[in-house]
C-alpha cells in the first residue's frame, strides 16, 4: 500500500504543479505580459525603426468632440475627429493670462498655428503628428530621430553637452538610459511652436522630458513631462502608445507644404486687383 500512496502523492503533486504553471502563464487583467525585446550590441533596448502615434493628440491633447474645420471650402478634409485626452487628469495648468492666450489661439488657429505655415513642429508635437518618424541608434550611442513632417530631425546626444547657444524650433536634446527606458531632456526652444491645433502653447522657458519604453517588439510607451514656469503653474504630463510601422516597404517620404500656405504667408505682398477676398477673414470660421 505504501507504493500506492507514493503514486497518489506524485499524481497530486504533478497536478498541483501543472495548475500553478497555468496560473502563472495567464496574465492578470490589466497586466502587460513580459515580452522579450531585441537589444543592441551594448545591451540597450533596440528602438530602431519607423514609429507612429495613432491617436488624435495632433488635433487636441485634451478631450474634444468632433467638429467641422475652419476652412469651409475644404469640407471634411479639415474636420476635427473626436478624441480622448492624453493629458494626465485632462487638465493643462495654465496661468490665468496664458489660459486667455490659449483661447485666442484656438479661435484664430488658421492664422496663428506654426503648422499651418509649415514651420518646424517642435517637441513633443513632432512625435504625435499624423506622420511617421524614424529612430536610428548610432555606433557612438547618439540617437537620430528623423520626422516625415517638414523633414524635421534632431540628434539626441548621449553625453553631457554645453548649454544651447541659441533657441531653436526643435531645441537641444540630451539623452540617458534609466534601466530599459530612454530618457530625453530637451531645452533651448524658441516660443514659436504649439503642442497641438487647439492652441496649446509655451514660452522659451519650455523644458520637455520624454521617456521611451519598449513594451513589445512593435510598441513603445511614450510619456512626456512638460515644464514651463512662465506659462504653467506646475509640471504636467502626457502619455500615449507609439506603434512600429509594419509595412514591408515602410520608409519616410518627402514632405511638401500645400500651396495655399504660401498664399496665407505671402498673399499680402501680391499685387491686388480689387476682386480678392481676404483669405483668413472670408473663409474661416469655428462653430
Task: Give the label of every model feature segment.
Residues 2-287:
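PEST-like low-complexity, intrinsically disordered acidic/proline/serine-rich tracts
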Amino acid at each position: 500500500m505504501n507504493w500506492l500512496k507514493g503514486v497518489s502523492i506524485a499524481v497530486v503533486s504533478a497536478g498541483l504543479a501543472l495548475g500553478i504553471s497555468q496560473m502563472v502563464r495567464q496574465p492578470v487583467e490589466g497586466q502587460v505580459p513580459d515580452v522579450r525585446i531585441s537589444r543592441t550590441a551594448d545591451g540597450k533596448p533596440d528602438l530602431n525603426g519607423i514609429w507612429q502615434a495613432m491617436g488624435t493628440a495632433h488635433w487636441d491633447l485634451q478631450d474634444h468632440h468632433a467638429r467641422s474645420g475652419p476652412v469651409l471650402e475644404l469640407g471634411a478634409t479639415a474636420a476635427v475627429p473626436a478624441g480622448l485626452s492624453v493629458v494626465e487628469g485632462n487638465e493643462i495648468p495654465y496661468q490665468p493670462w496664458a489660459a486667455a492666450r490659449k483661447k485666442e489661439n484656438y479661435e484664430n488657429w488658421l492664422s496663428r498655428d506654426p503648422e499651418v505655415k509649415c514651420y518646424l513642429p517642435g517637441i513633443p508635437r513632432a512625435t504625435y503628428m499624423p506622420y511617421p518618424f524614424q529612430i536610428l541608434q548610432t555606433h557612438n550611442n547618439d540617437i537620430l530621430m528623423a520626422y516625415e513632417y517638414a523633414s524635421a530631425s534632431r540628434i539626441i546626444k548621449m553625453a553631457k553637452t554645453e548649454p544651447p547657444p541659441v533657441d531653436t524650433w526643435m531645441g537641444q536634446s540630451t539623452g540617458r538610459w534609466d534601466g530599459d527606458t530612454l530618457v530625453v531632456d530637451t531645452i533651448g526652444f524658441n516660443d514659436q511652436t504649439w503642442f497641438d491645433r487647439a492652441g496649446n502653447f509655451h514660452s522659451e522657458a519650455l523644458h520637455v522630458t520624454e521617456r521611451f519604453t519598449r513594451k513589445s517588439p512593435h510598441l513603445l510607451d511614450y510619456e512626456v513631462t512638460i515644464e514651463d514656469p512662465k506659462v504653467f503653474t506646475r509640471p504636467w504630463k502626457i502619455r500615449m502608445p507609439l506603434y512600429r510601422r509594419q509595412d514591408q516597404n515602410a520608409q519616410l517620404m518627402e514632405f511638401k507644404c500645400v500651396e495655399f500656405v504660401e498664399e496665407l504667408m505671402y498673399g499680402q505682398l501680391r499685387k491686388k486687383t480689387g476682386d480678392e477676398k481676404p483669405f483668413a477673414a472670408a473663409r474661416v470660421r469655428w462653430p
